[in-house]
Amino acid sequence: MRTATLYRYSVPMEAGVILRHQRLKSRDGLLVKLQQGELSGWGEIAPLPEFSQETLDQAQVAAECWLQHWVSGVESDDSVLPSVAFGLSCAQAELNQTLPLSADYRKAPLCTGDPDELFAVLQALPGEKVAKVKVGLYEAVRDGMIVNVLLEALPDLTLRLDANRSWSRAKADGFAKYVNPALRSRIAFLEEPCKTRAESREFAQDTGIAIAWDESVREADFQVEAEPGVAAIVIKPTLVGSLSRCQQLVQQAHQAGLVAVISSSIESSLGLTQLARLAAWLTPATVPGLDTLDLMQAQVVRPWPDSPLPLITTEQLGVVWHR
């Protein structure tokens, strides 16, 4: 006997969470629960506005269609909508007990704001000091100066930077100009500095600052391959698709000598704990990019270890579909 339930959640965000062009006031998504006999499995379907190709309503329609087949005993292919494919594949993997339970709860802290505050946070980091800094929101020169100050002040710090394709080549060069060449090797990578891949490649080769592909990974013509100046690919499962697609990308990256980083798309605590399990399984040597829970005002169904945020339980969620 198979049953399935689809829940909808809405979690208020902290003030000041801005995506590309809009403030994100709440994080809205779906949780799916599959039940077969004594076994159950959960997954999260949460398209990210401005980044996902599908809306939440479109994802819900696709999920309901897939679930209708599943409860009838008909096995369907992965959804073509990445967030749906990811959430349903997680639920199936939990149900089939193929998603390992061990998790990598390390997270590269996401740093925004005042450099003095960042310094205190980063100095207190235990173990390997890896942090992520969003760049491209302010002047490129300011970003360069902040990165330089942090690397200079903390000799054991490695930074991951993310520009979200926001710079022209000239602005990217303006950023690099303010980062001491002797410190640039401690930038693990800068995600997609320029508006085009060609400009980003040239930037990496001209400055010695390694880059990573992020948005590119989700484009139809993208190939995972070794290239001069390219250090990593960033895999955001909600935007990429099923667990098997994520696994394929990780394997291709490792074969090409690239680092693969499992990264969040601002999922709820349930989705984040699954990403931590995915990271421990597929990329155990790499700190995942999962420091987004504190952008929210609550957790959902499954808590992140040691988080003080209140937990929204299953009983508090709205059921949108059940069979």
Curated annotation (Swiss-Prot):
- Enzyme Commission number(s): 4.2.1.113
InterPro entries attached to this UniProt entry: Enolase-like_C_sf, Enolase-like_N, Enolase_C-like, Mandelate_racemase_C, OSB_synthase_MenC1, OSBS_N
**Biological process terms in GO annotation:** menaquinone biosynthetic process
Organism lineage string: Bacteria, Pseudomonadati, Pseudomonadota, Gammaproteobacteria, Enterobacterales
The cross-references to HAMAP family, in alphabetical order and at most eight, read: MenC_1 (MF_00470)
Q: Which UniProt keywords are listed?
A: Lyase, Magnesium, Menaquinone biosynthesis, Metal-binding
Source species, domain of life: Bacteria
Protein name in the entry = o-succinylbenzoate synthase
Entries under PANTHER family matching the protein = O-SUCCINYLBENZOATE SYNTHASE, O-SUCCINYLBENZOATE SYNTHASE-RELATED
Catalytic activity, as annotated: (1R,6R)-6-hydroxy-2-succinyl-cyclohexa-2,4-diene-1-carboxylate = 2-succinylbenzoate + H2O
Q: Name one Pfam family in it.
A: MenC_N
> Which residues does the record give as Mg(2+) binding sites?
D162, E191, D214
Q: Which cofactor does it need?
A: a divalent metal cation
By sequence similarity, the record places it as follows: Belongs to the mandelate racemase/muconate lactonizing enzyme family. MenC type 1 subfamily.
Quote the pathway field: Quinol/quinone metabolism; 1,4-dihydroxy-2-naphthoate biosynthesis; 1,4-dihydroxy-2-naphthoate from chorismate: step 4/7; Quinol/quinone metabolism; menaquinone biosynthesis
Q: Which Gene3D superfamilies match?
A: Enolase-like C-terminal domain (3.20.20.120), Enolase-like, N-terminal domain (3.30.390.10)
- Write one Gene Ontology MF term: O-succinylbenzoate synthase activity
Functionally, this protein is described as follows: Converts 2-succinyl-6-hydroxy-2,4-cyclohexadiene-1-carboxylate (SHCHC) to 2-succinylbenzoate (OSB).
Catalytic residue list: K134, K236
